[in-house]
Amino acid sequence: MSNLPWLTLIVLFPFSASFLIPLLPYKGNKVVRWYTLGICALEFLLITFTFCCQFHLSDPSIQLKEDYNWISFLYFHWNLGVDGLSMGLILLTGFITTLAILAAWPVTRNVRLFYFLMLAMYSGQIGLFASQNILLFFFMWELELIPVYLLLSMWGGKKRLYSSTKFLLYTAGGSIFLLVGSLTMGLYGSNGTSFDLQILTNRSYPIAVETALYFSFLIAYAVKLPILPFHTWLPDTHGEAHYSTCMLLAGILLKMGGYGLIRINMELLPHAHFLFSPLLVTMGAVQIAYASLISFSLPNIKRRIAYSSVSHMGFVIIGISSITDIGTNGAILQMISHGLIGAALFFLAGISYDRTQTLYLDQLGGIAVPMPRLFTMFSFFSLASLALPGMSSFVAEFLIFLGIVTNPYYSLIFKSIILFIGAIGVILTPIYLLSMLRKMFYGFKIYQNSLFFIDLGPREIFISVFILLPILGIGIYPNLVLSLWNEKVESILLQYYG
């Protein structure tokens, strides 16, 4: 069993299964829905089995290695492997994608193509987190682009073509920098050409070259994460995408940028990361406060949640740039936590739109009476997003701030300024989230019509509860997931502290 190519099976299974969708009998959409849900559930079970039976938590090195020579003259290998950092994000991908497929049940137009794209996206996301070859990393990064663009342009709102084109231009522009950086890193050096991440870990560069490489990769990640000022595609995309697509965008796609920042910039380019860290910490703090202010002023629910995502990604930037094990652990935990909370909020925003046919807060009000279950779930996830103690985001944000405080390289004045700016965002978060709840669920704006609204059904309650459980579990017992990547974080930071 241990000799099986587990990771290749995990990466290729959803994509391979998607090609059987056109062969399914044309008996309505039910067959395609259940087939896709079954494939995603089997994939998640395969990931869980691999994690439980083949993966060793105490080993920070790359495990389950697979290396196949794919394109010889390009030194392009199908090179896969996982450690605690990537395994946590792969588990998140499997969990969120399975629930997103279930959330997409109301989709009725071009269902076969829709689910084909969802499965292709599934494979691309897992392939990126499992890649141990920087060209394969780039290939998986680009593989995401096509399904997301089509999902946006075909199943989005009224401005779907504008938002999908904007997403395409931003992401493709960032990908150019990723490709240039990947090729330069692989071709540079006297030890021969190699794109293997494990070999590149031991390769050193002149500081000018390392800085240029770092900046090139940073531009690509700044688009996906996103980092100001490369964030403007995000509100447009989330505002127009179907809520099942939003679950994948907020839950997984944004985490690709944070993962790349740790896996490549922090691990392979430590000297440049040390130089860029004060700037990134400053940008992260400004992003938290700026996005919180913008979110408070927006009347559109999905755009407000989108800007809250930008704000929460600011914490990830600060944690990664704190250059401490506490802060980096907090950043990874924040990625997992936001992946769950962001997916849940967009799901609930989407199903509230299905019932009220509006996303604008000034057109809502009083719907807590006919839809108490929706109100309860929205309240839980809003409290989780504002980092209520006992929720996963509270632990993540606390660790990130503690990481900044314990950094031995930053001055006391710098730490105080960062904490002050970050605190502004922390204070604004409950203001814009609780005001959103008040405007949606209280008052009498549409109370008379709301008597005919249908509350959450069993499928929607199932999705909401299953996302809420890990948020509470991690909040109560953080070591449930911190033990996954703690050893890996310590091994990365040895480069900085020896």
Swiss-Prot record:
Residues spanning the membrane: 4-24, 37-57, 87-107, 111-131, 134-154, 167-187, 207-227, 242-262, 274-294, 305-325, 331-351, 386-406, 417-437, 461-481
Cross-referenced InterPro entries: NADH_Q_OxRdtase_chain4, NADH_Q_OxRdtase_chainM/4, NADH_UbQ_OxRdtase, ND/Mrp_TM
Keywords, ordered alphabetically: Chloroplast, Membrane, NAD, NADP, Plastid, Plastoquinone, Quinone, Thylakoid, Translocase, Transmembrane, Transmembrane helix
Subcellular localization, as worded in the UniProt entry: Plastid, Chloroplast thylakoid membrane
GO molecular function: NADH dehydrogenase (ubiquinone) activity; ubiquinone binding
GO cellular component, one term: chloroplast thylakoid membrane
First-listed, main subcellular location of the protein, grouped into a coarse class: plastid
Pfam family, one: Proton_antipo_M
GO terms under biological process: ATP synthesis coupled electron transport; electron transport coupled proton transport
Residues annotated as signal peptide: none
Membrane topology label: Multi-pass membrane protein
E.C. designation(s): 7.1.1.-
Broadest EC class assigned to this enzyme: translocase
Reactions that this protein is recorded to catalyse: a plastoquinone + NADH + (n+1) H(+)(in) = a plastoquinol + NAD(+) + n H(+)(out); a plastoquinone + NADPH + (n+1) H(+)(in) = a plastoquinol + NADP(+) + n H(+)(out)
HAMAP family given in the database record: NDH1_NuoM
Family of the protein in this entry: Belongs to the complex I subunit 4 family.
Entry protein name: NAD(P)H-quinone oxidoreductase chain 4, chloroplastic
Organism: Psilotum nudum (Whisk fern)
